[in-house]
């Protein structure tokens, strides 16, 4: 499932990043978002998700959330 389908407050392990866009993949990697890393959806607001990775919080749009498979 992708982060769009993930439940708020539950910790997941990232299985893969599904994108052919190298810039998007590089951006997610710079956030610490890569296979094997733990991730939590903190909250959702319309088209954005607030996620927690490595004790840091980020707001990402639905396109980024759709690329993250947990």
Model-derived features: where do they sit?
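Intrinsically disordered, low-complexity, charged/polar segments
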Residues: 2-5, 66
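Short, conserved catalytic or interaction motifs in soluble domains
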Residues: 19
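C-terminal structural segments of small proteins and small subunits
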Residues: 41-70
